[in-house]
């Protein structure tokens, strides 16, 4: 199994790369899985339908809360056999929820209404990155909704300024 993440730290894997990965796994008899927690961010950035990305994969997981606003939940997509095996394994390890209809409804709403808003998230991330650059911070190029900046010894000052604006910052 080869598992790829798209986006990866906010960076989009090009469709040509995905096609090459698909060819490679086929040549070696491997399955190809997409961790699509931010699949729709990648699709919006590339200007393509999510299916243009997922067609290269044997299985895909999609998070409904990251960026789409559902309270919880993910979807696993694959063959009927894969889904049957996944359900069995989920039960074996104690997974599953009873009466999850309300959460499923929130997930469906997110898919129907929130994907179109991801371009706004991307634009806001770019606006933040531009502001940080203008203030003299070293910021990586932004493709989607994630901003990575090196703030050095000015971290506390930036955190305090952001807090005054009602923004919480996290750092690694």
Where are these predicted regions, by residue range?
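Conserved PLP-enzyme active-site core in the AAT-like
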Residues: 1-165, 169-171
């Amino acid at each position: 199994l080869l598992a790829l993440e798209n986006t990866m730290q906010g960076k989009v894997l090009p469709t040509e790369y995905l096609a090459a990965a698909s060819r490679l796994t086929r040549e070696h008899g491997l399955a190809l899985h997409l961790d699509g927690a931010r699949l729709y961010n990648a699709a919006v950035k590339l200007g393509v339908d999510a299916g243009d990305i997922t067609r290269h994969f044997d299985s895909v997981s999609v998070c409904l809360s990251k960026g789409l606003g559902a309270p919880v939940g993910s979807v696993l997509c694959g063959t009927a056999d894969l889904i049957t095996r996944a359900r069995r394994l989920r039960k074996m390890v104690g997974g599953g929820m009873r009466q999850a209809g309300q959460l499923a409804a929130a997930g469906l709403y997110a898919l129907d209404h929130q994907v179109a808003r991801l371009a706004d998230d991307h634009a806001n991330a770019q606006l933040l990155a531009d502001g940080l650059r203008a203030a003299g911070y070293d910021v990586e190029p932004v493709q989607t909704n994630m901003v990575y900046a090196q703030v050095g010894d000015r971290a506390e000052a930036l955190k305090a300024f952001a807090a005054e604006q009602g923004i919480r910052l996290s750092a690694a």
